[in-house]
Amino acid sequence: MQTYGNPDVTYGWWAGNAGVTNKSGKFIAAHIAHTGLIAFAAGGSTLWELARYNPEIPMGHQSSIFLAHLASIGIGFDEAGAWTGAGVASIAIVHLVLSMVYGAGGLLHSVLFVGDMQDSEVPQARKFKLEWDNPDNQTFILGHHLLFFGVACIWFVEWARIHGIYDPAIGAVRQVEYNLNLTSIWNHQFDFLAIDSLEDVLGGHAFLAFLEITGGAFHIATKQVGEYTKFKGAGLLSAEAILSFSCAGLGWMAVVAAFWCAQNTTVYPEAWYGEALILKFGIAPYWIDSVDLSGGPAFFGHTTRAALANVHYYFGFFFLQGHLWHALRAMGFDFKRILKEPLPAQLYE
């Protein structure tokens, strides 16, 4: 992270991963522990939503975010095709068990394994050391991330093809064969809010899987061509810069997801998320429900869709602010100077 020339900078507990910036082993431990927290939250929240679920009320009116996602991918239905929550408790418990495994893994990497991967006795592990200003090191690690994303897309495509996912057009779970029409995939990047074909949705994921796995293999296998010049980022590439890139990506995805969730009822079926939302403008854009739920069990009187869309949008907005903050710091701007140095005299005139 940006230290402004101070070699002895220290970080408080609230600084998160900043304290393990140059300790790749501890960095991996933090990643594993974070995965455990996510698994615990998913498992615990799913059990809580299942315990309070009322089959007499539409799921989208009960603020059941985790149940809605499971129902969308065809989980929880009985043999007659009705959603009963079958198997959902088992999935939640598996997540809770995995959270303990991930937690133990985080402790193992944090306490017993080397703090920096470059000190490891395993040659393959040493390849995952962190050299923030080394593009060959960063592209190698990026390639592995892309491979995981690509495999996840394949899992989703194959799950939909073999098991099936919920299709709101027929109100039932069905098997979906992906449509790998490149023209259709290209065009949907401009009208994805209105996409109404699960085949096209799965085709997009299949195409993404190809791009990400190909890109991952490319990044792992290749090194930078030519000299690492200032034009290519020499002197700029750093932990702070890469954090800013990550914040930008998360922010952009969150904003896109917010608009998609608010309007699209194919990927986000009304049966599970509630009715489509109405876009409003105040200090910032926001969405409101198109139905009145003030007397229902939903939190704050809103549908699951309203909660997802608005939370995604505002988190995305703040992630984009985080991107600007960290990008400026990576470029050398010291925000503390604003408080330390007096303003120009002409500002007081």
From Swiss-Prot:
Cofactor(s) this protein requires: divinyl chlorophyll a; divinyl chlorophyll b
GO cellular component: photosystem I; photosystem II; plasma membrane-derived thylakoid membrane
Membrane topology, from the record: Multi-pass membrane protein
Keywords: Chlorophyll, Chromophore, Membrane, Photosynthesis, Photosystem I, Photosystem II, Thylakoid, Transmembrane, Transmembrane helix
One Pfam family per UniProt: PSII
Transmembrane segments: 27-47, 65-85, 88-108, 201-221, 241-261, 308-328
InterPro entries, sorted: PS_antenna-like, PS_II_antenna-like_sf
Any one GO molecular-function label of the UniProt entry: chlorophyll binding
GO biological process annotation, one example: photosynthetic electron transport chain
Annotated compartments: Cellular thylakoid membrane
Family stated for the protein in its record: Belongs to the PsbB/PsbC family. IsiA/Pcb subfamily.
Described function: The antenna complex functions as a light receptor, it captures and delivers excitation energy to photosystems II and I. The Prochlorales pcb genes are not related to higher plant LHCs.
Extra information: This low-light-adapted strain contains 7 pcb genes.
Quaternary structure (record): The antenna complex consists of divinyl chlorophylls (a and b) and divinyl chlorophyll a/b binding proteins and binds more divinyl chlorophyll b than does the antenna complex from high-light-adapted Prochlorococcus.
Name of this chain's protein: Divinyl chlorophyll a/b light-harvesting protein PcbE
Gene name in the database record: pcbE
